[in-house]
Amino acid sequence: MDTKLLDILACPVCKGPLKLSADKTELISKGAGLAYPVRDGIPVMLESEARTLSTDERLEK
């Protein structure tokens, strides 16, 4: 995924910023507590496709 997209993409649920996961397979929204998958370099920005972050993941910086 092109990291330049992070400058313009926002979480569709909370409208907050997104962060690319360390393994580059998810876009993380701390505000919504969701992780959106990145498939074949394309972010899937659907709430129904996102997974809920664990408590530990929400507390990470």
Swiss-Prot record:
Cystine residue pairs: none
GO cellular component, one term: cytosol
Name the record gives this protein: UPF0434 protein PSPPH_1629
SUPFAM superfamilies attached to this UniProt entry: Trm112p-like (SSF158997)
The family this protein is said to belong to: Belongs to the UPF0434 family.
Lineage, uppermost ranks: Bacteria, Pseudomonadati, Pseudomonadota, Gammaproteobacteria, Pseudomonadales
Organism listed in the record: Pseudomonas savastanoi pv. phaseolicola (strain 1448A / Race 6) (Pseudomonas syringae pv. phaseolicola (strain 1448A / Race 6))
